[in-house]
């Protein structure tokens, strides 16, 4: 860090051998402390700060919020041991031969020999136990294998039953679908048989029914003329009859002329046709 005015170094705190200085925050104990070997106490105006003497790890903290403690260093200084490469074995082969000659022969006691058969019997017991354990293990293994086989057979049977049931269900569903399809085909055939296609088109029928208006008017004129003739014939026949027909005074006798006039009023076309004749 650079300052416009260098601070005043009040004092320098250093640790003893095997110790270090721990600068810890008194307000926040969760913060890790600074472990250093020496600290400078500097002042900027009326405020004091702790500054690390080691410039590779600099820090500047207020002295009022931090405390300095001397803690034993956990590091162990190991000294390097130098290896002496010029070590030689004294005597060489001759020393080894002398050692073999000077060594006394071992004395065999009788007691250990007497105790040897007892010791020999002891290993037999573990062998029997091992055999029994091996038999038990084999028996357990056989039982386990049999159980496994039985479980496999049961699983195969259950799978076969399930597949058989599913196959039956599929067969029944297929049969029902086939029957429904057959019924639908029969119904469709009946519908087609009940409703045969028309022999003529609708346009042809309409064209046949349409008649010229001139022809219809001529037919109507002819029919009206025929009715007028028939009515006039009937009136003449009634007038020419021997029996006189007496009508009331209020009523007037109808004449052929009046009937013709009335018909002409109601049917002008017929009257014009009669005049032309």
UniProtKB/Swiss-Prot annotation:
Residues 256-267 have a biased composition (Low complexity). InterPro entries: GrgA_tf. Residues 127-145 have a biased composition (Basic and acidic residues). It comes from the Bacteria. Residues 146-156 have a biased composition (Basic residues). Residues 107-157, 245-277 are annotated as: Disordered. Transmembrane segments: none annotated. Belongs to the chlamydial CPn_0623/CT_504/TC_0791 family. This is Uncharacterized protein CPn_0623/CP_0124/CPj0623/CpB0649.
């Amino acid at each position: 860090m650079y300052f416009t005015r260098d601070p005043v170094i009040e004092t320098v705190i250093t640790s003893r051998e095997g110790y270090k200085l721990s600068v810890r925050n008194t307000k926040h104990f969760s913060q890790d402390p600074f472990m250093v070997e020496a600290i400078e106490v500097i002042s900027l105006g009326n405020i004091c700060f702790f500054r690390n003497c080691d410039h590779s790890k600099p820090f500047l903290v207020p002295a009022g919020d931090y405390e300095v403690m001397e803690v034993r260093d956990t590091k162990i200084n190991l000294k390097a041991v130098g290896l002496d490469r010029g070590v030689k074995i004294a005597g060489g082969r001759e020393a080894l031969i002398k050692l073999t000659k000077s060594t006394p022969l071992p004395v065999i006691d009788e007691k250990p020999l007497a105790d040897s058969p007892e010791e020999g019997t002891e290993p037999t017991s573990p062998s029997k136990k091992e055999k029994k354990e091996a038999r038990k293990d084999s028996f357990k293994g056989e039982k386990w294998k049999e159980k496994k086989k039985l479980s496999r057979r049961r699983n195969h049977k259950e799978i076969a039953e399930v597949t058989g049931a599913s196959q039956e269900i599929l067969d029944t569903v297929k049969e029902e679908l086939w029957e429904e399809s057959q019924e639908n085909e029969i119904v469709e055939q009946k519908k087609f048989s009940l409703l045969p296609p028309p022999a003529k088109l609708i346009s042809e029928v309409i064209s046949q029914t349409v008649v010229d208006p001139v022809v219809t008017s001529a037919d109507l004129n002819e029919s009206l003329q025929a009715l007028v003739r028939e009515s006039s014939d009937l009136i003449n026949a009634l007038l020419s009859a021997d029996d006189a027909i007496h009508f009331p005074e209020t009523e007037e006798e109808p004449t052929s002329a009046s009937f013709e006039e009335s018909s002409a009023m109601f049917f002008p076309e017929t009257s014009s046709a009669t005049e032309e004749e």
